[in-house]
C-alpha cells in the first residue's frame, strides 16, 4: 500500500509537538458539476515545534501516535510571512 501524503496549511500550533493542518480537496459536484472545495483538519506530529500558523506543510500518514494523531510533518514547504 502506498503511503498517503497531503499538503496543507497550519491553522494551529498551540499544542506541544502537535499542529493542526487544514487540507483542501477540490472535486466536482456529482449532479451540478460545480467545483466544490472541502476542507478537512488533521492533527500532525511536529517533533521540533518548528511549524508556525500559516506555514504550508507536507504531512505523511504514520502509525497512531495518540487518540487522534495519525500524521506527521515531513517538511515545511513555505513559511508564513
Curated annotation (Swiss-Prot):
Signal peptide: none annotated. InterPro entries: NA-bd_OB-fold, Ribosomal_uS17, Ribosomal_uS17_bact/chlr, Ribosomal_uS17_CS. Coiled coil: none annotated. One of the primary rRNA binding proteins, it binds specifically to the 5'-end of 16S ribosomal RNA. It comes from the Bacteria. The keyword Ribonucleoprotein applies. GO terms for cellular component: cytosolic small ribosomal subunit. This is Small ribosomal subunit protein uS17. Part of the 30S ribosomal subunit. CDD domains: Ribosomal_uS17. It comes from Synechocystis sp. (strain ATCC 27184 / PCC 6803 / Kazusa). Transmembrane segments: none annotated. The keyword rRNA-binding applies. GO terms for biological process: translation. GO terms for molecular function: rRNA binding; structural constituent of ribosome. It holds the Pfam family Ribosomal_S17. Keywords: Ribonucleoprotein, Ribosomal protein, RNA-binding, rRNA-binding. Belongs to the universal ribosomal protein uS17 family.
